[in-house]
UniProtKB/Swiss-Prot annotation:
Any one Gene Ontology molecular-function term assigned to this protein's record: structural constituent of ribosome
GO cellular component: cytosolic large ribosomal subunit
Name assigned to this protein: Large ribosomal subunit protein bL25
Classification via Pfam families: Ribosomal_L25p
Annotated function: This is one of the proteins that binds to the 5S RNA in the ribosome where it forms part of the central protuberance.
Biological processes, Gene Ontology terms: translation
Keywords: Ribonucleoprotein, Ribosomal protein, RNA-binding, rRNA-binding
InterPro entries: Rbsml_bL25/Gln-tRNA_synth_N, Ribosomal_bL25/Gln-tRNA_synth, Ribosomal_bL25_long, Ribosomal_bL25_short, Ribosomal_L25_dom, Ribosomal_uL5_bac-type
Organism the protein comes from: Shewanella oneidensis (strain ATCC 700550 / JCM 31522 / CIP 106686 / LMG 19005 / NCIMB 14063 / MR-1)
């Protein structure tokens, strides 16, 4: 199964910025690896919560449409809230 997530590049970095994004229903994330510069991104929480419910999300290549350009990535790490069904941050690596 293929997964596609639409994301935007983050302009504000830091704890306060991340908290504001989470409060607005967004998920901060980062894409790194393959000798490229890390890219901070943000996307809607509903996009990732539905996709990650399937086990093959963690092993398959996820397509992120980042500012109109498609990027193939894999989920490396995911931080979740302690008791709420909320994803707080995702690390992706280039596929």
């Amino acid at each position: 199964m293929s997964y596609t997530i639409t994301a935007q590049t983050r302009t504000e970095i830091g704890k306060g910025s991340s908290r504001r994004l989470r409060h607005a229903g967004k998920v901060p994330a980062v894409i790194y690896g393959a000798g490229k510069e890390p890219v901070s991104i943000v996307f809607d929480h509903k996009d990732i919560i539905n996709a990650q419910a399937n086990d093959d999300f963690y092993t398959s290549v996820v397509t992120i449409v980042l500012d109109g350009k498609e990027v193939g990535v894999r989920a490396q790490a995911m931080q979740r809230h302690a008791f709420k069904p909320i994803i707080e941050h995702v690390d992706f690596v280039y596929a």
